[in-house]
């Protein structure tokens, strides 16, 4: 109560709010990793089949503009992956958001985080701001995961093998990080939402670059193999 009075004197619209309500929505280690791991699992199951019709049709030509290339088809399939990602992300996160509002009401979303956490520097940053930043960060990470699965799919040309490799590369690391308290988007958002966004963007860009390099190496390998066969 004394803290709320202090905040009120500073011109902050202080409110009582159950800390558990906020933690259950954006700062719950269990819910964060469970939801994101479930989303990644859905991606691992669905994304490999986007390119599967091309595994036996010179799929590697899809990723470069050559005389035999199919750039339009490649980017069309990328759009399909993005739509699949958006549907999966919405289906997983929106229902929880709706349940939260139905249970606690929308007013609690406007509560400044300084009413809950004393170490928050920006007094205007509210629960809804934290929720939005949290969702943006997870969507960027999910996009990066989609790039990883696509790269594995291009490299292996096998849906089932892609699922196995993607599980090792994505799902298992998530399970390994589960017990580390500070490795959570919600933790970063509370301490510095700018750092959370920047770090997530950098990680996503890095993964995208690695994906493109994998496709480049695979294309070069295939081109060399075809030249050798042509000479033979």
Which residues are covered by each model-predicted region?
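Intrinsic structural disorder
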Residues: 1, 38, 48, 56, ...
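Secretory targeting signals
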Residues: 3-54, 74-155, 159, 193-200
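Hydrophobic/aromatic residues in alpha-helical transmembrane segments
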Residues: 43-47, 59, 148, 210-211, ...
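Membrane-helix interface linkers and caps
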Residues: 55, 61-62
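Hydrophobic/aromatic positions within or immediately flanking transmembrane alpha-helices
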Residues: 61, 74, 162-163
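Long, hydrophobic, well-ordered secondary-structure blocks that form the structural core
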Residues: 62-63, 83
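Short helix-to-coil transition segments within interhelical loops
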Residues: 64-70
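Terminal transmembrane helical anchor/hairpin motif
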Residues: 105-133, 160-232
